[in-house]
């Protein structure tokens, strides 16, 4: 929080001016020799705590009905501690799920007179204590006061203070109401009359408190909270965890942008001789060698994960196997037995809420939005990971084994095929406060369920798996191991690596010996797709089998001891490891390199495999279309008896994944290869290299043939008549009213076609093309791009009459042509911010050319009614756009 003291000066002078000119100085108050009990400003300690239940621990807590007294010892005043707030029990839908984090801060208690302030410590800025720059910081930057608590009692002998924390806990101090507004689409109000304190637990290093909050929506029209018995009263249990910070901070390791770690950042204004005031520390566990002189040593304290009793028996050995598969990476950092998996003790000595234990647990939700989540407790001063508790959604693996996608809305299909659209929308609504949470989001459920659905279909089409059967354990086991390794990787500090799939040469994908050594992808932090061989006689590993080349390198960067006595020496040590970033298998990119609309690198994707994403897109789309066009599709997926709605969901799964694969081609258009490279490192390359013009043309040709062509999504009429809708009508199922009974393949195809067309005309993409024109004579130019798009979408119009057959026979082609005309028209009349001026001119030119094509074709006397009506309508749209564009451009200045 910034406190701008310059704003206080006028108010101070105004106050002084209002004082009497000859005001007398106040006389000192007399001090009595001894205060009687009745003179004490606070209640007596024993009397205040009468009938309370004491829970001894980090902060001693005393519980009495609606009061929750916290004892603050003198040493605990101005002692920073971690506060992590999470949703202990949600409603199982709308993203309001148990286990999800809400807020984390560093807090401290400060006494001011008869009150104790609950203060959020500003950890963003730091300076060496006692220096002039430290004094300057104190004048400019302060802390935030979250609450002022009346002192209820003070112990005579220890001077410990009692405050009632209940009013803080049973409140909206974390701004949860705003988050619920975003989740539900309705504003909500905390109903204090229906809210209360929940359970409380205490441990030596942490205090755990809960509040049972009830929220009342302002308007229930259209509100969907079917998992709540009474939608007027929405219950959310909020969990507060206060924990101790290490007395001796860990020596931090500075981050390097070439290796993917979560980090904590602080500004140190004393670093005026450095290139930045920022200090960035990676998140890592405190691993110290028991024998510092040994090349390989056991740690003083290993990283231990306890597998909780909530994990089903069958999964426990797989979970422990996955945890300990990280050991090979730590061996590369000089540690043996650095990471250990244990079954959670079954006695009262163990509690997963005790910060001394890191756990893996299973949870269940009515409508899960994540497959797993791995929140960690971080010391913001150093980046030290103090504790981690991984939650797996039980239905994720059920989805992997049994379920296909159910697509109910155009937005769901569009964002499923082009995930960056959803991420962009979420980022747009993310405040600065929760932006860090956006970089840490993990959509593991989507990766796992879609992968399982496709693998199951493949095995059924092979005849390996009987129709209607779930994916068997021999295929589920490696998927579970990957998923657990992925989530454990997050709690070791690692971010996603969406470049790792391109580290494997495509010809090596089915080479089991190669993929066992290097990984099917170089990092388990990837979102992979099953490695399905299109030559079914030569099938390799479906899933990677352990830590990959990147994982081993990243762990070495983060955890290998440097033995350095000074921070600069440790930086030099870590930099030498990071300098290996251009070696094969060390490629790295993460969420912000992959999801944004202006993310330019076609190699940074999710759900791809191999070093040629465009080649992958070609092969995967051919394979998916082959599946739904196979005459055996129904019999192999459903069998002779069974639920035909499963066939519809299977078709939805294939169409969605077709869109995911095809969408990778869009990134080649106006794309650039981005390398995280530092000056002078071995093998140094240019950090930004435009994609070759020939490759961009190849990508557009692919989109033209496999997305925008009239027959791109063709399926047999017989199959479409067999795709049965669901006929259930109760809570937890889609509302059947207003839902089409037939399978709208046309609409689904148009959603994907239009999304990729819009992405191909995005301002950032066109701007990059324009910039590339000045860098190379052999560039893919904006003018060529528009011309090729027009030919791809309107090529049959204006030519030979025999080419018009697709236009007359199906509305799909006519619809995407209208979308293209509308996109060009919008570029003239209401261009998106950032659209290059050249693009507006070229849009006008292409509209004129489309008008000419339509005019020539309308002279053909044998045109069908559909085609003639379509061309006349297109000309009318073009005319309106050109006239409106002229009016906009010639409008006088005001």
Where are the model-predicted features located?
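Sec/Tat signal peptide C-region and signal peptidase I cleavage site
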Residues: 19-23
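Sec-exported extracytoplasmic/periplasmic mature domains
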Residues: 324-335, 365, 490, 494, ...
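Bacterial N-terminal signal peptides
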Residues: 9-18
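The catalytic-center signature of Zn2+-dependent metalloproteases
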Residues: 343-364, 369, 478-534
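Bacterial N-terminal signal peptides that target proteins for export
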Residues: 1-9
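Stable alpha-helical elements in mature extracytoplasmic
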Residues: 315-322, 476, 480, 484, ...
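Auxiliary tRNA-acceptor-end handling modules of aminoacyl-tRNA synthetases
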Residues: 24-68, 73-311, 329, 333, ...
């Amino acid at each position: 929080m910034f406190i701008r003291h310059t704003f206080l000066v006028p108010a101070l002078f105004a106050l002084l001016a209002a004082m009497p000119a000859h005001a007398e100085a106040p006389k000192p108050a007399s001090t009595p020799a001894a205060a009687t009990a009745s003179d004490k400003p606070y209640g007596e300690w024993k009397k205040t705590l009468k009938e309370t239940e004491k829970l001894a621990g980090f902060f001693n807590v005393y519980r009495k009905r609606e009061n929750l007294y916290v004892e603050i010892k003198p040493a605990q005043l101005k002692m920073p501690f971690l506060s992590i707030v999470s949703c202990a029990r949600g409603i199982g839908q709308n993203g309001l799920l148990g286990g999800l984090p809400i807020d984390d801060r560093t807090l401290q208690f400060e006494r001011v007179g008869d009150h104790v302030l609950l203060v959020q410590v500003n950890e963003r800025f730091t300076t060496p204590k006692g220096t002039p720059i430290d004094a300057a910081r104190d004048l400019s930057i302060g802390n935030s006061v979250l609450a002022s608590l009346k002192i209820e009692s003070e112990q005579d002998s220890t001077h410990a203070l009692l405050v009632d924390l209940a009013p803080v806990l049973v409140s909206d101090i974390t701004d949860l109401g705003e988050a619920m507004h975003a989740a539900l689409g309705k504003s909500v109000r905390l109903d204090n009359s229906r809210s209360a304190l929940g359970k409380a637990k205490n441990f030596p290093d942490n205090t755990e408190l809960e509040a049972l909050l009830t929220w009342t929506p302002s308007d229930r029209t259209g509100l969907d909270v079917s998992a709540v018995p009474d939608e007027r009263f929405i219950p959310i249990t909020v969990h507060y965890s206060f924990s101790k910070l290490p007395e001796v901070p860990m020596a931090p390791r500075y981050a390097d942008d070439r290796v993917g770690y979560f980090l904590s950042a602080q500004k140190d204004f004393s670093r005026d001789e450095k290139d930045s005031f920022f200090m960035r520390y990676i998140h890592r566990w405190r691993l110290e060698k028991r024998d510092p002189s040994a090349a390989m040593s056991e740690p003083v304290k290993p990283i231990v994960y306890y597998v909780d009793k909530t994990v089903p028996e069958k999964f426990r050995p797989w979970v422990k196997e996955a945890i300990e598969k990280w050991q090979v990476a730590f061996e590369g950092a000089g540690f043996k037995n650095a990471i250990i998996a244990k079954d959670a003790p079954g006695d009262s000595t163990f509690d997963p809420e005790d910060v001394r234990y890191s756990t893996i647990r299973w949870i269940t939700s009515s409508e899960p939005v994540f497959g797993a989540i791995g929140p960690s407790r971080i010391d913001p001063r150093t980046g030290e990971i103090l504790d981690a508790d991984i939650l797996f959604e039980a239905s994720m693996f059920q989805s992997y084994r049994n379920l296909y996608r159910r697509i109910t809305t155009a937005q769901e299909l569009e964002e499923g095929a082009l995930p960056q659209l959803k991420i962009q929308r979420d980022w747009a609504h993310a405040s600065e406060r929760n932006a860090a949470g956006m970089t840490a989001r993990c959509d593991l459920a989507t990766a796992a369920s879609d992968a399982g659905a496709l693998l199951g279909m493949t095995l059924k089409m092979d005849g390996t798996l009987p129709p209607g059967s779930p994916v068997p354990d021999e295929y589920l086991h490696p998927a579970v191991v990957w998923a657990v390794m992925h989530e454990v990787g997050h709690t070791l500090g690692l971010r996603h690596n969406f470049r790792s799939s391109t580290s494997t040469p495509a010809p090596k994908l089915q080479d089991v010996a190669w993929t066992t050594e290097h990984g099917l992808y170089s990092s388990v932090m990837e979102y992979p797709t099953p490695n399905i061989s299109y030559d079914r006689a030569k099938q390799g590993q479906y899933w990677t089998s352990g830590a990959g080349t990147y994982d081993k390198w990243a762990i070495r960067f983060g955890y290998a001891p440097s033995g350095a006595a000074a921070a600069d020496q440790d930086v030099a040590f870590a930099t030498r490891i990071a300098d290996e970033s251009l070696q094969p298998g060390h490629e790295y990119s993460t969420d912000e390199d992959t999801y944004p609309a202006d993310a330019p690198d076609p190699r940074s994707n999710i759900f791809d495999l191999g070093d040629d994403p465009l080649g992958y897109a070609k092969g995967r789309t051919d394979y998916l279309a082959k599946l739904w066009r196979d005459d055996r599709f129904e019999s192999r997926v459903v069998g002779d008896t069974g639920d035909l709605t499963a066939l519809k969901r299977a078709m939805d799964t294939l169409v969605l994944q077709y869109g995911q694969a095809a969408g990778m081609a869009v990134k080649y258009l106006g794309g650039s290869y981005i390398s995280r490279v530092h000056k002078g490192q071995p093998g140094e390359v240019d950090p930004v290299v435009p994609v070759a013009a020939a490759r961009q043309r190849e990508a557009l040709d692919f989109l033209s043939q496999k997305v925008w062509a009239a027959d791109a999504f063709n399926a047999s009429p017989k199959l479409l008549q067999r795709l049965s809708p669901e006929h259930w009508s109760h809570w937890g199922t889609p509302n059947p009213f207003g839902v089409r009974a037939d399978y709208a393949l046309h609409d689904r195809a148009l959603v994907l076609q239009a999304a990729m067309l819009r992405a191909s005309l995005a301002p950032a993409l066109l701007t990059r093309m324009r910039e590339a024109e000045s860098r190379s004579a052999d560039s893919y130019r904006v003018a060529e791009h528009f011309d090729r798009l027009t030919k791809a979408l309107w090529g049959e119009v204006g030519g030979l009459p025999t080419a018009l057959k697709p236009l007359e026979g199906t509305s799909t082609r006519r619809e995407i042509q209208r979308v293209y005309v509308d996109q060009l028209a919008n570029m003239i009349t209401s261009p998106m911010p950032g659209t290059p001026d050249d693009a507006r001119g070229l849009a006008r030119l292409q509209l004129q050319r489309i008008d000419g094509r339509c005019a020539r074709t309308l002279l053909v006397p044998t045109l069908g009614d559909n085609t003639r009506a379509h061309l006349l309508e297109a000309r009318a749209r073009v005319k309106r756009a050109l006239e409106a564009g002229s009016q906009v451009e010639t409008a006088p200045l005001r």
